[in-house]
Amino acid sequence: EQGYITALVKEKHTFGAEGAKVNVSFSVEEKDRHYIEKVKIVGNDKTRDNVIRRQLTFYPGEKLDTEKIRDGQRRLSNTGYFDMESGMPAGINFEQGSTADRQNIVVDVKEGRTGMLRFGGGYGANVGAFGDISYTDRNFDVMDMPKSWEDFMQGNAFRGAGEILTLRFSPGFERTEIMVSLTNPAVFDSPYSAGVSLFNFLRWYEVYEEQSLGSRVSVGREIQRDFFVRLSPELNLIDIDRRDDKEDTPQDVLDVKGGHLKAGVTLSATMKKTDNVFAPTKGYEGESSVEVAGLDVDIAKYKFQTTKYNTLFEIPKWGKHVISYGGTFGVVESTSGQEVPIFERFYAGGYGSLRGFRYRGVSPVDSKTGDQVGGDVLIVIKPNGCGIGN
């Protein structure tokens, strides 16, 4: 970590005075400290140099710190820009510089497919039967216009700026979602991020139907490595209706039946210290958020959730077995003196919450109908084991 990447190691053997024993000692002589002269990027046919460099934690002129180099390599792998199947999506090599104590760092990346078009469907305990048509590109460039139709079809357009584009249409019998979002994680290569999304969300719960149509803008900043703060204003039109197939409807649903215009802002802080963003095997992550909303929906909501990952054991050629455990805490209150609307309350149960319970099955119930109507406080502590391939 201090730049001493070469050393002279001498081994010495001495025989003990008694018995068949040999004492082995090593003497280590550190050579000259090395410094970084240049950082070279190779292999990036589509990804811009600046998009790669902003992920690195080492710079020309610094002492050669192998810990920083490993951290930069990890961050590059976690971007998803490069070919994970190659085994080494972002290699780091040393090259002799202009003097004996100078080294050039060569970052050798292998471009991968960052755009994913998915057609699918299935059945989930939380959402019922559903279909899914979505496209996600983690290395999008809204300014990289195609020069021809062939240029577009070969994937040589709209690539290389590290922006994240998501298009999704997911119809279902219990939930339908339409969403478009675009995020720039490093505006002008600064620590600031910006994003915008449009969404239309329909959900058929057991006791009511909800449609949410709106837009969200987010502005964030990376305070330090792996620690982010984000401010997200949102304008949302929420429509609540009773289920036609329900004979008795809870009064909490009837109280909010109709349209509600909600204007809110959420301040969130996220810490992510895991070895891999997509399939973590060690480390932890956590998020804390505060939301304040007004107009027709006057609430203040606080939520904190965290997850810890540990590798229990690893079987060669089978992968690692990882256990994750964590918890969620939330509290919501009305700022108008009225009750918190049923669609802003907390529920537990189902996949991603409490296994063994049906979706939103853990909740206070209406005294007359017995239906789940949500609560103002949420506390969930959960362990979860999962198998990881690598």
In which residue ranges do the predicted regions lie?
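C-terminal outer-membrane beta-barrel translocator/porin domains of Gram-negative envelope proteins
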Residues: 98-104, 115-128, 136, 234, ...
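Repeated loop/turn-to-beta-strand initiation elements of outer-membrane beta-barrel proteins
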Residues: 83-84, 115-117, 128, 139-146, ...
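Periplasmic polypeptide-binding modules associated with outer-membrane biogenesis and secretion
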Residues: 1-124, 137, 145-184, 210-213, ...
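A generic structural motif
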Residues: 60, 147-152, 189-200, 202-204, 292-296, 313-328
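Glycine- and acidic-rich phosphate- and metal-coordinating loops
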Residues: 106-110, 166, 195-199, 285-289, ...
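Transmembrane beta-barrel wall of Gram-negative outer-membrane proteins
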Residues: 169-261
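Residue patterns forming the tRNA-binding/recognition surfaces of aminoacyl-tRNA synthetases
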Residues: 1, 217, 270-272
